[in-house]
């Protein structure tokens, strides 16, 4: 009986960790990795196609988009929103690295 108890508890622990998902933390903020992935997709759609338009800030465009994840909206109110979104985009570029907790900002593996 005890032979099966330990492996069962281990499997339950792994399942509980995976069910909670991966959390990305940046300062006072904490987001699901899924929201960060959506942000990356949205930023790729919003990148200007005309090289002359690179001077304008992209934050208002992102924050006002109807596809912008609700979970990330508090970032838009911060003066350093662009810096935070850049850090999140770095994580989103390779989400598999975050899923194995290679970044200190990621938790819940």
UniProtKB/Swiss-Prot annotation:
The secretion signal range is 1-21
UniProt keyword annotations, A-Z: Disulfide bond, Secreted, Signal
Q: Which cell locations does it reside in? A: Secreted
- Domain of life, per UniProt, equals Eukaryota
- Disulphide bonds in the chain: 63-76, 98-106, 101-109
* Chief localisation class: secreted
Listed GO cellular component terms? extracellular region
Propiece residues? 22-94
Which GO terms label this protein's molecular function in UniProt?
Answer: guanylate cyclase activator activity
Of which family is this protein a member?
Belongs to the guanylin family.
User: What the protein does?
Assistant: Endogenous activator of intestinal guanylate cyclase. It stimulates this enzyme through the same receptor binding region as the heat-stable enterotoxins.
What protein does this entry describe? Guanylin
| Source organism | Sus scrofa
Q: What are the leading ranks of the lineage? A: Eukaryota, Metazoa, Chordata, Craniata, Vertebrata
